[in-house]
């Protein structure tokens, strides 16, 4: 059975170790699992834990939510590189954050879903629109510009 990596089935995504798609490693991993991928959209889920370095007094911080969005973008880049282009992981950097609106910070034990949609990609830059939701309640929305280094992580 061949896998269509551009339109992967849920059962394939469930088998992925998300850490293999990221340049970040524990304890700085802010995403839990990849639940959806296509050429323009990616969705991750994360359980907010008390052990997370961005959790304080039972609440996941705004910085943690922003990093969660950035790492969801990184998972997309890692997935494309590893499964579509068959190359190594590249390191990305947040170039800009615009239209950031934070409505509520999630609590320990809540499961957040991060949805990133690519608006434009050109010259190693990706402009993406993102939102993080918890039980269909929007927690944060933002636009993020990500720059990707051409060289692969060693």
Annotate the PLM regions.
Residues 32-35, 98, 103, 117-119:
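Conserved positions in beta-strands of structured domains
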Residues 11, 75-113:
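Hydrophobic beta-strand-centered segment that forms part of the acyl-chain substrate-binding groove
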Residues 25-61:
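Catalytic strand-loop segment that frames the active site of acyl-thioester-processing enzymes
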Residues 2-8, 43, 75, 107-113, ...:
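HotDog/MaoC-like acyl-thioester-processing domains
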Residues 47-81:
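A conserved, well-ordered hydrophobic junction motif at loop->secondary-structure transitions
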